[in-house]
Amino acid sequence: MKINILTLFPRYFEVFCRESIIGKAIKHKKITINVVNFRDFSKNKHKKVDDYVYGGGPGLLLQIQPVVDALEKVGGLKIALSPQGQKFDQGVARKLAKEDEITILCGHYEGFDQRIIDNFIDFELSLGDFILTGGEIAAMAIIDAIIRLKPDIINPESLKNETFNDFLLDFPQYSRPANFRGLEVPNVLISGNHREIGEWRQEQRELITKKKRPDLWEKFLKIKNKK
C-alpha cells in the first residue's frame, strides 16, 4: 500500500515514519509513505500558498494552484482532512485498508479553497467535533488505524477481539503480579479454565459497552437480534 501525505509541515512525519508499527511496516516494505510538501508547487516567487478570502473574513485560505498541482502528481483515493468531513471510525479504516493507494491532504490556516474540495477530492474526513491547528495529527491517527489492519502487520488473533470489531468495547486485561497492594486480578483469569475465561470476557465486553457507549450497544443488539 502507498500513502501520499500532502502537507506544509513534512518534518511532522519524520519520527512517525521511523517508530513503532509504522516504522516496521516501512522497513519490511509492507507500506510506502510519500510525504509531499505542497509549498514546493507554488508558482509564487516567495513560495506563498495562502491568501485572503474573497468576500472578507478573518484568516488566510490555502490557494487552489499549489494544492491542485500537488494533487495531480499523486494517485489513489484523494482525501481531505476537514471538520466538515465524515467522521472517521473503524469501519472507514477497514475500507481504506483495502485500497492500494490513498492520498491524504492536510489543511492549515482557514482551510481550503472550496474548488479544491468540489473538484479534486474524493471525500473529506474528520476525527471528530473539535478543531486542530492543522491536519497532520489527524493524518497520523488515520494512517496508524489503517496500517495496523494490513496483513502481516499485527497478529490476526490480536485484531479479532479489538474494540469496535463487533461494536463491543474490549474486555479488561491484567498482568503480573496477581495481587498488587491488595488489588487482585479476577480469580477466573488465573483459574486455567479457558471456557469460563471466554465467557467472562464476553460478559465484560457487553457490560462495559452498555455502560460506557450506549450508542455502540444499540448497534450490537441490532446485529445480535438479526442472527
From Swiss-Prot:
Subcellular location: Cytoplasm
InterPro entries reported for this sequence: Alpha/beta_knot_MTases, tRNA_m1G_MeTrfase_C_sf, tRNA_m1G_MeTrfase_TrmD, tRNA_m1G_MTases_N, tRNA_MeTrfase_TRMD/TRM10
GO BP: any one term: tRNA N1-guanine methylation
CDD domains in the record: TrmD-like (cd18080)
Pfam hit, one: tRNA_m1G_MT
Record bears the keyword tRNA processing: yes
EC number: 2.1.1.228
GO cellular component: cytosol
Keyword check for Oxidoreductase: no
Catalytic activity of the protein: guanosine(37) in tRNA + S-adenosyl-L-methionine = N(1)-methylguanosine(37) in tRNA + S-adenosyl-L-homocysteine + H(+)
Keywords recorded for this protein, A-Z: Cytoplasm, Methyltransferase, S-adenosyl-L-methionine, Transferase, tRNA processing
Source superkingdom: Bacteria
GO molecular function list: tRNA (guanine(37)-N1)-methyltransferase activity
Binding annotation for S-adenosyl-L-methionine: 107, 127-132
Protein family: Belongs to the RNA methyltransferase TrmD family.
Function: Specifically methylates guanosine-37 in various tRNAs.
Quaternary context: Homodimer.
This protein's name: tRNA (guanine-N(1)-)-methyltransferase
Organism: Mesomycoplasma hyopneumoniae (strain 232)
Organism ancestry: Bacteria, Bacillati, Mycoplasmatota, Mycoplasmoidales, Metamycoplasmataceae
